[in-house]
Amino acid sequence: MKVQSFGERVVLFILNAIIFGRLERNLDDDDMFFLPHSVKEQAKILWRRGAAVGFYTTKMKGRLCGDGTGACYLLPVFDTVFIRRKHWHRGLGTAMLRDFCETFPEDEALGVSCSMSPAMYQAHPGNSEDVSRHARTSQNDRPRQPAPGDGSKERMCGEELEDTKDDPECGVEEEDAGLAGQPPGKLTRSSP
């Protein structure tokens, strides 16, 4: 659900500053800390069974990158992402990424903001395919080059998401993730 009202901004602030900032963040870890989001920044809250369980923010194409820089974002950027710990490993991050990609169907390229928390680099436990497919297991790893004859190919996020969309192991459908209920044109992207 796109954040539009004052009440939704309050929910976003509580998720960001209180739940993540105080309750779920280990201050001894190198976890990321999110600053309060500008009213000008686009955000969506992830709802599950009536509770706000996460959010993501987007930097819009053409917006200034920062005060005094004069540089603008050249494409929409998937910026801040937060999912409450008790909802991890349920496919909600993938559902948010899919929603972000489907929000900008007219754009050929989309961006993902750096830096990422250590948790974002963890592969799903017990699934060696995730490690080899993404070729990274930690933020310090460099992407692995496929061996000759490996049969691997570079994939765009939309292609990979289409493959996992109907996968029963994906863990969550858009409706269960709280991203359904939006106009169908914003949730579906026609295949080429």
From Swiss-Prot:
Chain residue ranges for the region called Disordered: 121-192
Top-level division of the source organism's lineage: Eukaryota
InterPro entries cross-referenced by the UniProt entry: FAM169
Bias kind Acidic residues: ranges: 159-177
Family (UniProt): Belongs to the FAM169 family.
PANTHER family, sorted: PROTEIN FAM169BP (PTHR22442:SF4), PTHR22442
Protein name: Protein FAM169BP
